[in-house]
Amino acid sequence: LALAFAAFPRAVLSAPETPPVVQNPPRTWIDPETGHRVVRITDEANTESLYFNDNCFTPDGKEMIFTTADGGISVLDLATWKNRAVVKGKVRVIIVGHRTPRVFYIRSEDNALYATNLDTAETQKLANLPAGGGISAINADETMVAGTRVLEGNPARRFVTGKGNGYQADDKMEMMERRLAAHLLNEIYTIDLRTGQEATLIRNRDWLNHLQFSPTDPTLLMYCHEGPWWKVDRIWTIRTDGTQNTLVQPRTMEMEASGHEFWSADGKKIYYDLQTPWGVVFWVAGYNLETKERTWYHIERSEWSIHFNATNDETLFCGDGADNPPGPWADASNRWIYLFVPDTVINGAPWKTVRWNFGTGAGEALVHPGVFHGEKLVHMVKHNYLLEPNPIFTPDKKYIIFRSDMFGDTYAFAVEVAKAVPGP
């Protein structure tokens, strides 16, 4: 499971305390400040939707998975919001397959990878993991998995605040600094599920993390150099044969920061949070792997979010807000679930007619500037942002899924993209 470390210290303002537990919280309501309907889609307390870039939907787009209070996995019907348990016992979920309706996960008792069919409940053990190794990515045709492992020393433990693995720690930034400075030998490895063959893809002393296979190309893996975003060349892609190891976002200024990258649904683009420099100018950047074109959508600081996401057709984006935007001017104005409409036209003219030069060499790609037009959907004023909401669009674009402890316990919620029509 990809680590959800953000790269920014929580300064000036602290996250709100988790509110008191509300027994039988409302099933649905209309946010009085936005006019958008919110639905609590999980019944059991301390259930969570997945990390923002982990596929949680079945290939037909009709169901999604979530984690249960005891660490298992349940599946939710997106038409009725009814759910059923599919995997019991404490497991570590990875993703739902892109080709078959199977959920992939790891059982810690035997450190092995399993897959369970969400329709039939048929379960198969796929591979034993090497000592110290974890799996965090499954490729597009479900024939290969990728993971990381540290080969020397003891990596800094990921501290959490006690309620569940979705919560981040107050000392997260310090942990990241320590881990980056340790320069531990680590590697990305793959396992071919057809043959069981294990192979080392990369081995070095950079902090390798955040693995994501392309959703369409089974031979293409994205990974990152983890650490404070302004200290690392973060986003990379590599082929499963070890070739074409490529830096996606070369830094061009001091304190430039990029991270929380994710694939477009068609596998043609990589999107990510970009700040030039950190805490001053904010973008959601897109890089087209086929054409090498770059598009930077400017975003207001008051709408910056910990995570961004996009619909399958990339016509809409969303963000989960933040308790403290990065930079020296922290405030609480970002505590919203946001909807963003991307625009590359200003004053009636395409922005691409005034493209900026990116890089220094002849023939370098030019950046297509754009802008996000934001709309507030859910006020998250009672949410403790140590639990990151991790927004995800449903495949039909009608809802944004997120997790929250606004009622004390954690549940998964859905907010309707269209404004609700209030009843009498």
Question: What does each model-identified segment do?
Answer:
Residues W29-S49, P369-M380:
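A short helix->beta-strand "capping" segment at the edge of beta-propeller domains
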Residues A15-V39, E177-Y189, T360-V367:
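Blade/loop signatures of beta-propeller domains
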Residues G89-E187, G196, T200-R203:
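Asp-box/WD-like beta-propeller blade repeats and closely related beta-sheet repeat scaffolds
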Residues T47-I65, G89-I106, P130-T148, R203-C224, ...:
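Conserved beta-propeller blade repeats
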Residues M64-D70, R102-L118, A127, A146-E152, ...:
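Beta-strand C-termini and the immediately following turn/loop, strongest in propeller blades
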Residues D77-W81, N117-A121, D192-G196, R239-T243, ...:
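Short loop/turn segments that connect beta-strands within beta-propeller blades
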Residues L387-P424:
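Blade-level signature of beta-propeller repeat domains, shared across WD40, Kelch, NHL, RCC1
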Residues D273, W278-W283, H298-F372:
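Loop/turn-rich, solvent-exposed surfaces of beta-rich toroidal or solenoidal domains
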